[in-house]
């Protein structure tokens, strides 16, 4: 075991110096937690709770959808979302196909997002249904390899009453238009895709995510 400087100075005797981690893909932790604590809350947002089992179910459906769109092991799936509950199932669902997730700064403008999509070689992207996000995404995918855009709405995770009333009253933001040839919707995936993930051999050493730098001194690096 390597001896580090911080181990030599007042390291608590009852705290282990190393931890053993299981040799398994990242999504295996979600599957295990869903089996063990399936009915417990995983996320709570705007009064709506999603359990571990529900998030796993959504991740499996997303994985099946992506596989149906030709996503294979080693392909890149971009996530252009702010901090919404879509992120965990999209992340785990992408990983279940063997794909590598590329996280995109939700503050990016068209040119910045276009660079990252090109540089990473992403062929699918998840985006929030919002005037500030969806049109930017459609512009940014021009001259890239992206063939699939999944639009995620805030209403997907709202309590049913809030979602219905918010939609009727125009309180839930939505894109002014959708590019039909590449667009799919998050809620359709959850209702139409199978809840059992495709069987893909994923090595724990495979690349799970590409995280780009902030780009303060030049173009972001990933």
Where would I find each of the regions flagged by the language model?
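AMP-dependent adenylate-forming
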Residues: 3-8, 28-51
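Structural core segment of the AMP-binding/adenylate-forming
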Residues: 68-69, 96-188
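Conserved pre-ATP/AMP-binding loop-to-beta segment of ANL
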Residues: 174-212, 219
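Conserved S/T- and glycine-rich ATP-binding loop of Class I adenylate-forming
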Residues: 55, 77, 94, 125, ...
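Flexible, non-catalytic linker and terminal segments flanking ANL/adenylate-forming cores
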Residues: 1-23
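Conserved AMP-binding/adenylate-forming core of the ANL superfamily
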Residues: 20-22, 39-84, 88-92, 109-114
């Amino acid at each position: 075991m390597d001896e580090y400087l911080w181990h030599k100075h007042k390291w608590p005797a009852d705290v282990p110096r190393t931890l053993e981690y299981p040799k398994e893909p990242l999504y295996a932790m979600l599957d295990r937690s869903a089996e063990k604590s399936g009915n417990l809350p995983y996320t709570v947002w705007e009064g709506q709770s999603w359990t571990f089992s529900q998030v796993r179910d959504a991740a499996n459906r997303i994985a099946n959808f992506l596989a149906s769109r030709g996503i294979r092991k080693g392909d890149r799936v971009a996530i252009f979302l702010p901090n919404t509950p879509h992120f965990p199932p999209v992340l785990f669902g992408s990983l279940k196909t063997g794909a590598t997730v590329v996280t995109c700064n939700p503050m990016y403008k068209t040119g910045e997002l276009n660079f990252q999509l090109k540089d990473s070689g992403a062929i699918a992207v998840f985006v929030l249904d919002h005037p500030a996000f969806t049109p930017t995404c459609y512009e940014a995918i021009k001259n890239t390899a992206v063939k699939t855009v999944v639009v995620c709405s805030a209403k997907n995770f709202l309590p049913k009453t809030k979602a219905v009333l918010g939609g009727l009253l125009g309180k839930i933001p939505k894109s002014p238009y959708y590019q039909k040839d590449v667009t799919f919707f998050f809620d359709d995936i959850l209702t139409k895709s199978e809840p059992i993930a495709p069987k893909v051999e994923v090595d724990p050493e495979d690349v799970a995510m590409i995280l780009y730098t902030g780009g303060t001194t030049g173009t972001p690096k990933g």
